[in-house]
Amino acid sequence: MFHPSRPMGFPMPDITILLSGIAVCFLAGVLGGLSGAGTGLVIAGFLAPIVGAKAVMPALAIIMLINNGSRIFYFFQSLNLKIVLAMLVLATPGSMLGAKLYVDIPVSFFEGALGLVILLVLIIKTWRRMSASGPVAHWKPQKIWWALGPVSFVYGFINTIVPGSGVMVLAFLSATCMTTSAVIANDAAIAASLNLVKVLLFRQLDALPDPLVLIAVACGIASIPGVWFAKWLSTRLKTKVQHGIIDGMIALSAIHLLFRAFG
């Protein structure tokens, strides 16, 4: 459980930290709005020295609830509710289990395993793209839907424990050959739903004191203009460029997880 060691839990940030935080959250919003990944990792890196490592995951639950909510709003036309609901059926129990075990579980093991799996998915996806004789749309992506159940549960569990683990479901959705906007919209809907569950659970576990809630809400709101800018920019980028951004963020996130696990 989170036990603040200072009055109100955290020192009041000065104006420099506040301005830096706004800039970081804006850029993180742009990155996530273009690729579906990276927002949590960037903000987590900024917050850790301010609120403490153990408070990062509870804070991110609120931040990403707000951030993903804005992605749903801006990319709503690409949302597939059937896929979202199907994944949430198993992801939600996994998220609840992860939240309850968060304070005691060895995170490094999951970071390493997740990083390796994500890199493997990306390599297979890239190989299939290079070896396909026709357009990407001819890959017959329905062959991988059998993995939806296991991926959903594992994602829900790890998402509560490891910052940046949302890239797992991003890699899965990307491998189904969805459009870029559909990947971002469906990933955001799944993540927002799970983050709502995590917020409620962390509050019950006393891991989200009021001062931390205020900091997290401020960070989440600061990221919304970045998502809007990403939506505007995405309509002006070529599809190949957007796919490249997504693949690049998936690879960087996986490498980052491996570095944290074994570095």
Spans of model-derived segments:
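Membrane-interface helix termini and inter-helical loops of multi-pass transporters
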Residues: 9-11, 99-109, 133-135, 202-214, ...
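Small-residue-rich hydrophobic segments that form or flank transmembrane alpha-helices
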Residues: 14-86, 151-156, 164-223, 227-231
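Residues that define the loop-to-transmembrane-helix transition and helix capping
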Residues: 54, 82, 108-111, 181, ...
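Residues within membrane-spanning alpha-helices of integral membrane proteins
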Residues: 61, 114-118, 122, 188, ...
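Transmembrane helix exit motif
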Residues: 68-78, 115-139, 231-232, 252-263
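Glycine/small-residue-rich loop that forms an oxyanion/phosphate-binding "nest" at active or ligand-binding sites
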Residues: 81-125
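Hydrophobic alpha-helical transmembrane segments in multi-pass integral membrane proteins
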Residues: 155-163, 198, 253-263
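Interfacial loop-to-transmembrane junctions
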Residues: 228-250
